[in-house]
């Protein structure tokens, strides 16, 4: 946790939170079918009101995962603060087989101790399944809550939690000197800050695998350019500013390469830069347009969009040579893929019968499942644990961010009131 705190502290030191309206998750479908769980409000052991509702943060995280349905506080049969106070039968009678309790204690130095316990109320009643405590300053109380959520989520599902991650996105506001902003927030929309403001469009943010940098497209020079910005100090490195189009950056999982699309020779083609040397290699060639690269876990293979068969479809290709292989066959066109960190599936924008939705394709069987039901969906980005997808869609006259679970059962919106929100990118684990 200390390493993650240092990374996040670097963000806080350089940018104050945005005063504009932040995005917030609004669940639209699926929580009722999820596993019920009890999350008791964490007991506050200090004077006055608690500085943060840690239990509420944990409950929201678990609900937002789409895999849990925390019991409403008005229905809690008791409000214990420790495992010893939990009465398992009171919870099991409500179909609850696990309960989270906790305690927040102020320290003389101004810090806080946050402690939680995950208690079995089903198979082995009263057994403590997981527990931990953290000493944090006030600004890290939400982070402590997300940490507890990550640990509980992994204990109960076997899947690493992704509640301490962030999302990057572009907001286009109405008017002002800098109507385009690249922003970053916690995955749930809290702690939003601005990375870059521009009078011209910003596009396609992409995270480095260590979460320390963002690559993106800017038009501030009058034409498109690819840059990489270091979040800790704001330093900007220009990667590509060739004639015509420079776009669609994607860091390799090993952090040594950046793939992107250029049209300096006419058609769009894929290129890969070695980030240490700055050397650029052309990967695809020909008259077709090849763009929107995404990496497989081996850092040697790309999935990408190509119109070589007429309509856009997703192909894959080794960057060291060989022919491109088409991997999408369902629907009239498929594009803008994002491959999961284990390489077992990808999500993409799939169009069929005039509808444009987010779909998931199993890369072993080829099976395709449509996940979203919103309008003109685009730019899907997977959570690092592969359980959720964030994407943008059209709503009214603007665009908003949406979440959908990769099993398609859970859906939520992240609306913002101060502009159009698009081009989301989910961070790696931080």
UniProtKB/Swiss-Prot annotation:
One of its GO terms (biological process) is protein import. It comes from the Bacteria. Keywords: Cell cycle, Cell division, Periplasm, Signal. Pfam families: PD40 (PF07676), TolB_N (PF04052). Its main location: periplasm. It is found in: Periplasm. Residues 1-21 form the signal peptide. GO terms for cellular component: periplasmic space. Belongs to the TolB family. The Tol-Pal system is composed of five core proteins: the inner membrane proteins TolA, TolQ and TolR, the periplasmic protein TolB and the outer membrane protein Pal. They form a network linking the inner and outer membranes and the peptidoglycan layer. Part of the Tol-Pal system, which plays a role in outer membrane invagination during cell division and is important for maintaining outer membrane integrity. TolB occupies a key intermediary position in the Tol-Pal system because it communicates directly with both membrane-embedded components, Pal in the outer membrane and TolA in the inner membrane. This is Tol-Pal system protein TolB. It comes from Salmonella typhi.
């Amino acid at each position: 946790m200390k390493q993650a705190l240092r990374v996040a502290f670097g963000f806080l030191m350089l940018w104050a939170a945005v005063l504009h309206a932040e995005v917030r998750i609004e669940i639209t479908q699926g929580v009722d079918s999820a596993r019920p769980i009890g999350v008791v409000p964490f007991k506050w052991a200090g004077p006055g009101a608690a500085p943060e509702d840690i239990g509420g943060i944990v409950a929201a995280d678990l609900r937002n995962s789409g895999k849990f349905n925390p019991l409403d506080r008005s229905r809690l049969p008791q409000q214990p603060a420790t495992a010893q106070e939990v009465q398992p039968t009171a919870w099991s009678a409500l179909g609850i087989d696990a309960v989270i309790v906790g305690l927040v204690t102020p320290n003389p130095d101004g810090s806080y101790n946050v402690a939680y316990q995950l208690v079995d109320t089903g198979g082995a009643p009263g057994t403590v399944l997981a527990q931990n405590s953290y000493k944090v300053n006030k600004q890290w109380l939400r982070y402590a809550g997300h940490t507890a959520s990550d640990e509980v989520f992994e204990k109960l599902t076997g899947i690493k939690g992704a509640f301490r991650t962030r999302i990057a996105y572009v907001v286009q506001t109405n008017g002002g000197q800098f109507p385009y902003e690249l922003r970053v927030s916690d995955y749930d929309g809290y702690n939003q800050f601005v990375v870059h403001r521009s009078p011209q469009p910003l596009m396609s943010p992409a995270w480095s695998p260590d979460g320390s940098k963002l690559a993106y497209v800017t038009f501030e020079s009058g034409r498109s350019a690819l840059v990489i910005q270091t979040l800790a100090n704001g330093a900007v490195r220009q990667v590509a500013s060739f004639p015509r189009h420079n776009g669609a950056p994607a860091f390799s999982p090993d952090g040594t390469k950046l793939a992107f699309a250029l049209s300096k020779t006419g058609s769009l083609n894929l290129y890969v830069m070695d980030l240490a040397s700055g050397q650029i290699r052309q990967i695809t060639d020909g008259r077709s347009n090849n763009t929107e690269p995404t990496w497989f876990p081996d850092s040697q293979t790309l999935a990408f969009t190509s119109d070589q068969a007429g309509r856009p479809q997703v192909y894959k290709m080794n960057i060291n040579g060989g022919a491109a292989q088409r991997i999408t066959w369902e629907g009239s066109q498929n594009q803008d893929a994002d491959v999961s960190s284990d390489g077992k599936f990808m999500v993409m924008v799939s169009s069929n019968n005039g509808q444009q939705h987010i779909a998931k394709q199993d890369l072993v069987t080829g099976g395709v499942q449509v996940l979203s039901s919103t309008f003109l969906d685009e730019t899907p980005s997977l959570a690092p644990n592969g359980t959720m997808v964030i994407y943008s869609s059209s709503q009214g006259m603007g665009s908003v961010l949406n979440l959908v679970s990769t099993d398609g059962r859970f859906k939520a919106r992240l609306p913002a009131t101060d502009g159009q929100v698009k081009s989301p990118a989910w961070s790696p684990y931080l």
